[in-house]
């Protein structure tokens, strides 16, 4: 039973230890000129791509979805690039470095969310939607209320995720490049705005693809060099790691990540359903031409991510063997220079020298840029498409909608920079956990039930969705992370760190109860529209850019 609970707790990749890669204390490193030069090459390449993309962005369709011309393979790479964060690369390899086997469960467990997207969501989402998941949620329900709720859910998730990434960017760049924190945050903010403002989804997609290729290449090379060192024998790798690790054989045993069964379930559910409710991930399914390509996207993305997280396991054990046993990477007190989260970076130095160290440092920074670009575009589309064009000013022209989207990108960029600076010394590890909980408690139930439950009504979706969102936020505030660690109270009112188990239940029960008891004429009409929606969700008939599949 403990192994099952350990695996469940492991499924939130950014929580606890992995989040520390972006939020823990950092020690500024000497200026790394190789890393800076390689990063500048990456920036120049991506700025050229943005310029190239800007010449091809002529319509709303181009801006939001790259014209629907991205292939399943390209989109799979871009999704992987959007999802493989610096926290998972540095944090999970650091967790393997310190805890051994637990890190494998931690790194692979989060993939549980992707089969849900593949089998339940990808095809119907592509057939029913155009630009945002609110298109799907509001397909047969009242546009105004549902789009407002979906946009609020999206913006809260984007804001929390964005703050965590910006603070993480500043601290990571302090670590890797020796640059000032404020300069780093401003640099990320400016580049993020340029990619999205001028290049839209096309530039964002190619930034994510390039980042994914670089990260997979870098991690593959590190894993190859580690395995070469041990004669390509996993037995030798584990034996040598056990010989030098302070915990000895204990690193090959599970346990130690779980406080209690409720926390384990809450973490597991938060990621499993949260992944299927992240607006910047869902938006990527509208960049392909049809449902077949959407399914292929998930297939490729899951393959790339699964491969990457297996590599982090090898990298973690390689770090135990080549970094942990080498005094050159330790300070006077015997701890790893820069902290345990630098294990993968030090391993890059150990297997590839200073040049490869510079490459991995630049890739870590590129990783953050790819993630924040996707978040910014998702936030901007929620405001311009869902709120402005479909709620506040119905009948707005494409030009007006694009103008609002680009103004929103600028505002999001400024706000992200200011909040990144404001939260510099705060514990922001909880923010990504909260983002996943809200995505799982508000966005996911509405998307799933709008596509699969014929009796869903606007009243049920609105009340249940808001209940889920508010429950997630309130329980998080009353929990040990915010109530005790941040606000300084003696004891938490809500005893568990993550609220997903409770807030998801509240959302689904609320949606079911208030839909089932809705006897209004509007509710009856919405139920009758389900058959037409079901036919389109299966066939794609009538969809823009739709092709046979």
UniProtKB/Swiss-Prot annotation:
Superkingdom in the source lineage:
Bacteria
Task: Give the InterPro entries listed for this entry.
Answer: Cation/Ac_symporter_ActP, Na/Glc_symporter_sf, Na/solute_symporter, Na/solute_symporter_CS, Sodium:Solute_Symporter
Q: Name one GO biological process term.
A: plasma membrane acetate transport
| Principal place of residence | membrane
Give me the Gene Ontology terms describing cellular component. Answer: plasma membrane
Segments spanning the bilayer are 33-53, 76-96, 103-123, 149-169, 183-203, 206-226, 262-282, 303-323, 355-375, 404-424, 428-448, 463-483, 493-513
* GO MF term (any one): symporter activity
Q: Which Pfam families match?
A: SSF (PF00474)
Has the keyword Zinc been applied to this entry? no
Ordered alphabetically, the record's keywords are: Cell inner membrane, Cell membrane, Ion transport, Membrane, Sodium, Sodium transport, Symport, Transmembrane, Transmembrane helix, Transport
Where is this gene product found?
A: Cell inner membrane
**Bilayer topology term:** Multi-pass membrane protein
Q: What does this protein do?
A: Transports acetate.
Homology family: Belongs to the sodium:solute symporter (SSF) (TC 2.A.21) family.
User: Which HAMAP family does the UniProt record give?
Assistant: Acet_symport_ActP
- The entry's protein name is Cation/acetate symporter ActP
Q: Which organism is it from?
A: Enterobacter sp. (strain 638)
Gene from which this protein is expressed: actP
């Amino acid at each position: 039973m403990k192994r099952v609970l350990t695996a469940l707790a492991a499924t939130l990749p950014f929580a606890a230890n992995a989040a520390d890669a972006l939020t823990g204390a950092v020690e500024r490193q000497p200026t790394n000129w190789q890393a800076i030069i390689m990063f500048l090459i990456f920036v120049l390449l991506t700025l050229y791509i943005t310029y190239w993309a800007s010449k091809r962005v002529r319509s709303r369709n181009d801006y939001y979805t790259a014209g629907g011309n991205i292939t399943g393979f390209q989109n799979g790479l871009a999704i992987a690039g959007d999802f493989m964060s610096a926290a998972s690369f540095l944090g999970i390899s650091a967790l393997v470095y310190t805890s051994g086997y637990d890190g494998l469960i931690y790194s692979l467990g989060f993939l549980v969310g992707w089969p849900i997207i593949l089998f339940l969501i990808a095809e119907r989402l592509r057939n029913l939607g155009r630009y945002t998941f609110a298109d799907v949620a509001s397909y047969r329900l009242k546009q105004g209320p549902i789009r407002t709720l979906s946009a609020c859910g999206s913006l809260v998730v984007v804001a929390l995720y964005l703050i965590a990434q910006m603070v993480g960017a500043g601290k990571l760049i302090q670590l890797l490049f020796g640059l000032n924190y404020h300069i780093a945050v401003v640099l990320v903010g400016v580049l993020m705005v340029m990619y999205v403002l001028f290049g839209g989804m096309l530039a964002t997609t190619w930034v994510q693809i390039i980042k994914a290729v670089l990260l997979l290449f870098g991690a593959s090379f590190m894993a190859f060099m580690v395995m070469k060192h041990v004669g390509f024998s996993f037995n030798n790798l584990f034996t040598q790691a056990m010989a030098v690790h302070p915990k000895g054989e204990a690193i090959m045993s599970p346990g130690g990540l779980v406080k209690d069964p409720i926390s384990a379930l809450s973490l597991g559910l938060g990621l499993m359903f949260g992944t299927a409710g992240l607006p910047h991930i869902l938006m990527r399914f509208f960049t392909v031409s049809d449902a077949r390509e959407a399914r292929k996207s998930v297939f490729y993305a899951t393959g790339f991510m699964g491969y990457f997280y297996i590599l982090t396991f090898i990298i973690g054990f390689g770090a135990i063997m080549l970094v942990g046993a080498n005094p050159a990477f330790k300070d006077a007190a015997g701890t790893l220079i820069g902290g345990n989260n630098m294990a993968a970076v030090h391993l890059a130095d150990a297997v590839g020298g200073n040049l490869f160290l510079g490459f991995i440092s630049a890739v870590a920074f590129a990783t953050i840029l790819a993630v924040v670009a996707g978040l910014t575009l998702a936030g901007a589309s929620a405001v311009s498409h869902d709120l402005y064009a479909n709620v506040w000013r119905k009948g707005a022209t494409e030009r007006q909608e694009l103008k609002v989207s680009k103004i929103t990108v600028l505002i999001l960029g400024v706000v992200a920079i200011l909040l990144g600076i404001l939260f510099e010394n705060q514990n922001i590890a909880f923010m990504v956990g909260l983002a996943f909980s809200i995505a799982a408690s508000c966005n996911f139930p509405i998307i799933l039930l709008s596509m699969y439950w014929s009796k869903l009504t606007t009243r049920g979706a609105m009340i249940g969705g808001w209940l889920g969102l508010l429950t997630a936020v309130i329980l998080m505030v009353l929990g040990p992370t915010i109530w005790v660690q941040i606000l300084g109270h003696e004891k938490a009112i809500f005893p568990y760190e993550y609220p997903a188990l409770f807030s998801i239940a509240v959302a689904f029960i609320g949606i079911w109860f208030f839909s089932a008891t809705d006897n209004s004429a509007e509710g009856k009409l919405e139920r009758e529209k389900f058959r037409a929606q079901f036919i389109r969700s299966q066939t794609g008939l009538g969809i823009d850019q739709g092709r046979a599949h």
